[in-house]
């Protein structure tokens, strides 16, 4: 059984005094990602103390992952985001493809290939 979807779970620690800037950049990232045909989900979750964030991303297939990673959101806005928060962990669920997989591994993402489950 295969599943072409790829999911990211990105954990961020928001820098002290940077919440408003963090939220502003997140809004820009959402506005850019919504324009990507292969993006199925791009959801942000804040902890109760508003110091930690989880970003859950879902892409239709590895080509959509590569398009996102080489697109303007990642190129232009991720550097701005990293001025407001530090990356705590980055997990990838599914096969991101060879090129994107190499880039993701290079930034410390842990990749979990699809093993088994419901299709869809």
Task: Please report, for each region that a protein language model flagged, where it lies by residue.
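Short beta-strand/turn micro-motifs at beta-sheet edges
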Residues: 1, 42-45
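Basic/polar N-terminal segments that are highly enriched at the extreme N-terminus
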Residues: 1-4, 117-120
């Amino acid at each position: 059984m295969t599943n072409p979807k790829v999911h990211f779970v990105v954990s961020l620690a928001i820098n002290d005094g940077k919440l408003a800037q963090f939220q502003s950049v997140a809004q820009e990232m959402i506005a850019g990602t919504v324009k990507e045909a292969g993006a199925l989900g791009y959801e942000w979750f804040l902890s109760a103390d508003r110091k930690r964030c989880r970003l859950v991303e879902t892409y239709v297939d590895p080509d959509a992952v590569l398009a996102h990673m080489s697109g303007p959101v990642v190129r232009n806005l991720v550097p701005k985001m990293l001025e407001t928060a530090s990356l705590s962990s980055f997990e990838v669920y599914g096969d991101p493809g060879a090129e994107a997989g190499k880039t993701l591994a290079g930034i410390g993402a842990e990749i979990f290939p699809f093993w088994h489950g419901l299709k869809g």
